[in-house]
Regions:
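Conserved PLP-enzyme active-site core in the AAT-like
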Residues: 2-29, 33-294, 298-307, 311-327, ...
Length: 343
């Protein structure tokens, strides 16, 4: 449980607090004006991340949503359609930003298992021949949050990447929890992002940084990224103060994600024991997200809150737990106990 509040907060991994090492790094950060490209700590973070995901360059942005929207602006033109899974963050959790900011719409395809069929790319191209909008981009999400944070099988990632390449379409990888996928699969982030033109990753989820995400891609694309970031209001000044925490996150917080994954599996077992018909297979919980069906989420949320456990929903009738650095084994057992007596 949180050593700060005494509450077991499983609503999201965005509630994590910066570690003591991050706070020290933030206090001591060497800074400059990042809009001029003169913040050495931001520059170091961007270079570190780009190397980690196998791309030429990266840019630091305030949020994952901005990173995704920036990719859409860089890789599409107004009027395009983006081929994406129907439950992906960029499709349903960004307040319609794609239409507003990039002038695009989605060709949403089935992603119930957390992936999309490579054939969906060719289907979208074929559909466009019949007076439909032109496909301009394929967007993927790894891990796929609504599908219990499932990491894509690497063979499937490669197959979709190959299908996009055959159709001459760029690929954007929403890797908000990319390093959870790396740890769970044993496949390096750079390999997982190899078929993507651009890749975004959040530092402020399981990696515990207080704020910030990164978008990386080829030099030819990223040359325009600063201008597009400015149009979205994302230019920051002495951002090294927060970038310093991101450097610590990439250095110290990735391997320990395995602890979060094990704790999520413990919760999944408890949920299945309490509600065998909830549609949750504990074996499908490979990272830090647990989702299940419940007939009265508001009653369950209230019960858990009364027991000192915070949970949330992601859709009508769908509950969610997300494990993270700030919830330890004792916190998990408290949640398990609360579940046993839940309505």
């Amino acid at each position: 449980m949180s050593v700060t509040t005494g509450v077991v907060d499983l609503r999201s991994d965005t509630v994590t607090r910066p570690t003591p090492e991050m706070r020290r790094a933030m206090a001591d950060a060497d800074v400059g004006d990042d809009v001029y490209g003169e913040d050495p700590t931001v520059n170091a973070l961007e270079e570190t991340f780009a190397a980690r995901v196998g791309k030429d360059r990266a840019i630091f942005v305030p949020s994952g949503t901005m990173g995704n929207q920036l990719a859409l602006r860089l890789l599409t033109r107004p009027g395009d359609v983006v081929v994406a899974g129907a439950r992906q963050h960029v499709v349903i959790y960004e307040n319609g930003a794609a239409a507003r900011n990039a002038g695009v719409q989605f060709h949403a395809v089935d992603d119930d298992d957390g992936t999309i069929d490579p054939a969906a790319v060719a289907d979208a191209v074929d559909t466009a021949a019949h007076h439909h909008p032109r496909p301009g981009l394929v967007c993927l999400e790894d891990t796929h949050m609504p599908a219990n944070g499932s990491p894509w099988p690497i063979e499937r990632l490669r197959a979709v990447g190959a299908a996009a390449a055959a159709a001459a379409l760029p690929v954007h990888l929403d890797g908000a929890r990319l390093f959870n996928a790396e740890v769970a699969s044993g496949t390096a982030a750079a390999e997982r992002a190899a078929g993507a033109t651009t890749v975004m990753c959040c530092l402020s989820k399981g990696l515990c940084a207080p704020v910030g995400s990164l978008l990386a891609g080829p030099a030819a694309v990223m040359e325009r990224a600063r201008d597009e970031r400015q149009r979205l209001g994302g230019g920051m000044r002495q951002a090294g103060v927060i970038a310093a925490a991101g450097l610590v996150a990439l250095r110290t917080m990735v391997e320990r994600l395995a602890d979060d994954h094990g704790r999520a599996r413990r919760l999944a077992d408890a949920v299945t024991e309490r509600w065998p018909g909830a549609g949750l297979d504990p074996a499908a919980v490979r990272t830090n997200v647990v989702t299940w069906a419940h007939p009265d989420p508001s009653a369950l949320v209230a019960h858990l809150r009364a027991e000192g456990v915070l949970a949330g929903t992601i859709a009508p009738g769908v509950m969610r737990f997300v494990t993270h650095h700030d919830v330890d084994d004792a916190g998990i057992e408290r949640a398990v106990k609360a579940l046993a007596s839940a309505p």
